[in-house]
Amino acid sequence: MASSRMYLLVKCMLILQLMVLIAKNSRALICLPCDKSKCEEPKPCTGSVVLGICGCCSVCAKQKNESCGGVYGLYGTCDRGLRCVIRPPLNGGSITQYEVGNCEDENWDDDQLLGFEPCNENLVTGCNIIDGKCECDSVRTCNNPFEFASQEACQTALQKIEEERPDCSKARCEVQFSPRCPEDSILIEGYAPPGECCPLPSRCVCSPAGCLRKVCQPGHLNILVSKSSGKPGECCDLYECKPVFSVDCSTVECPPVKPVQCPADSYETQVRLTADGCCTLPTRCECLPGLCTFPQCSAGMSPQVMSRGDGTPGRCCDVFECVNETKPACTLNGVEYHDGDMFRMDACRFCRCQGGVSVCFTAQCGVLHCERYYVPDGECCPVCEDPIYPVLSLAGCYVNGQILAHGDHWREDDCTFCQCVSGDARCVAAACGHSCLNPVTVPGECCPVCEEPTYITMAPPACGSLDNCTLLEQSCAFGFRLDPSGCRTCACKSREELCGGLMASCTLKCPFGFQTDIHGCDVCQCRPRHKKCKAVACAKDCPFGYIKNKHGCDTCRCKKCPELPCDKACPMGFQHDELGCLICQCRDQSSSSVTPAVKLGSCLSMDGRRHENGQSWHDGCRDCYCHAGREMCALISCPVPPCDNPTIRPGHCCPTCPEESSSHKPELSEASVCLAPGGEYFVEGETWNIDSCTQCTCHSGRVLCETEVCPPLLCHSPIRTQDSCCPHCPDDPVTPQTPSNDSMPSYCRNEDGDIFLAAESWKPNVCSSCVCLDGAISCFSESCPPVNCARPVLRKGQCCPYCLDATPRAVCHFNGKTYMDEERWDIDSCTHCYCLQGQTLCSTVSCPALPCHQPLTVEGSCCPMCPESYAPTNVPIEKTDQRGDKSRHQPAWPTHSENDVMPQFRGEFGSLQMPYLDGKTPLPSEDAGLHWAWVALPVLMMMLTLAALLLVNQRKQWIPVPCYRTPNKSTCLNNQLVYVDCQKGTKVQVDSSQRMLRIADPDSRYSGYYSMQKHNNLQADNFYQTA
């Protein structure tokens, strides 16, 4: 029994020590829900009582010289009249507010109880470490905002931080969320302390600028009610204006107060009261905060101090004036350089012009870890070279529009040097080294240099003034001519004089000559090998030049973008404009993942590659072609996998089951002709719809089809119906929702380390879909249903093969011509024919008896008409057949007048069905009885009413068609209703989901409204009738 108790005691002690150890090394603070019944009464306190760090139980306030502060305030809060003072570190480091301090007196004076008075600002100079750099400045402020008094101390601390920086490549840090700070505090973002990889949590700290003090009226005192605790939300002291009842101001005589006029750089302080609250004290002037700034002068001007400021009103700031910059230039080998210009003296030495003095320094090279190296032409530092291997082939390399031989070297950019090895470009980066804290980047050079003077080339010449010279800078395109002493003269320099000194220090041997600059002067860069190209016979006008082929010769194709004259060194590349052309602006690292601007007419394939319009390629499984901005790929034939979770393996083309060892080889369509699965032939460039979901084009004898990208499916075993192009879930799919509380995870991470937000869905491959739910990834597989065709096809980007509807379309043959299904043609002005499902159907017009004795026969009209009723209102007709050909001719029906009649159809379709197999022209019917029209009138009126009710529910769109003279009566035939109003314009209402044959052009002389339900061209022919 005793041993078990001893064992339990030892176990408790070990657990207690472990908890103490964890508490010492942990930065976490766990506060349980407040239950004041469990709080212990604090022992008799020397001072006042304050709340603990969790804000629940009361504890004794810390007294003078006791510890306070620390992480989360674990060491307590100082009593009233005391403040927690944290001493700055001796090594010059920054204060993080997590250090432990001591309680000291606040040193409040009586003036603080009488009103607010701004402090006296002083000019303070110092430095802070911001983003790994020392940022120095001079500001006028009440408190010193700088951590280091000088740049030397800041650089020493920065170098120490770099030396103590740990290896954070394998560190795993928790995601830190920034809190929302009250109005009296500001947010301090978390940062990694010296020696640690993970940043501290962001926190809110009190901001004195957020505290406002009350100004009381005469007869009231500003009394301190409660002292700030130093915590966010309790940062400010609370004052109240209370009347002074103990003093009778009626007997007090106040001295006169003179008004104060402050200068423009200062302001008048607020009115203060005497201790009894009866009289006002004199005000004074104080410098305006944030007034002093450093001026920004225009080009060629520099700021010069005219008078120094001492911080007193009227002289708060230094007074500057922008004056002309007359710094002398530098001259080297006859070339003049302006102040601040950096130039290259030779391969390894650089110079900067500073006040007429050329300060030069030597480039520093890094250590190479290779056995073979070489020094590129015009460079100082060597670069590594590939070891010598047996030459497999002497193939050249095509680089930047020119062909380089095996073994040739070239410079890809400022930091990359390449060599052609057996047809492959082998590139290495230059190794840089420097021994200073702030190396300088030289434009056009890879390695930064240390700007430490090694020698002085020349002293600034004592040159006279050119005040009497009338020449301006822009008058001399090549600069001013220099005298033997290097001073400017009042004469312009010629191009020969400018170019004379540029090649003085050049050591390159260029077999094809040197390149030239904008002035036509030779520069120390070799010209590439001359290209043997034939003259291009091209009629195109290309403002940006021609596109070059693989041999570097011009082709008859225009460049879409101009050349980019830019000398910026952009490590992340350049930005694009709205046309996809490069502009001389560096791309930010944050925008490196943004999709670049797309050129007009290009295609973005499913593998993320960009192809130009008209370009062909092979994606490993099928031939593809960029057609009008759409990716068109060949349909391949694949068997349907019999499992529930098929997948397309890398390097394979057809879906397979996980247990299968081999992949089916896809069968491609015939490449000789464009033969669609429906048995139709198509010519080169023709586009058609193979079904409701697939649009195809004929390219190089291959049928290439476009497919749409299907969204993720959050269910198992989705189905594909005939009326849908993508599979869908048979039941309600999983509905992802964002987390409703903060305890639920807001993101998921997959095996590759990719992060997905809550409720986000995606497709890791074409056969599965995933979603992020409650911090975990749930995936669903697509199963392929069986098919009933011999050769199912597989679209690119989809998982399951399916069958195409290969039903051939019927055609009609008449008089040696072939007509497509639903095509219409005219035999003469009285006979119209149609092709319907392979059968030729024709209709004729029956002419009625006329009351006149001498009827007129109008050209293009079928039936004669009386002279008194003839009105020449014919309009030309535009016909469109199945081939897209258009022709304009006079109407094949009579000019409409009051005596016009509707063509009479007989037979199954309308009133007449006449299959013409021998090609003979039919004779018009002689049945012209008018009494049949009166017999059929009630029936037609009933059909009119029914058709009107049906047409109300149809989805229609309005298109303009020509009008004719309004008939006496309108009748209904084949669900077509005519409304005519020649005063309001002509429109026809048709179903927007089907094609409508355009039968005439608008005529502004007449107007009318037609409402008809369109089924096919056969019904479109019966579009009016009069009786």
Swiss-Prot record:
Residue intervals annotated with topology Cytoplasmic: 953-1027
Transmembrane segments: 932-952
Subcellular compartments: Membrane
IGFBP N-terminal domain: residues covered: 29-106
Superkingdom of this protein's organism: Eukaryota
Methyltransferase is among the record's keywords: no
Region (Disordered) residue spans: 877-897
Keyword annotations from UniProtKB, A to Z: Disulfide bond, Glycoprotein, Membrane, Repeat, Signal, Transmembrane, Transmembrane helix
Annotated function: May play a role in CNS development by interacting with growth factors implicated in motor neuron differentiation and survival.
Record protein name field: Cysteine-rich motor neuron 1 protein
Record gene name: crim1
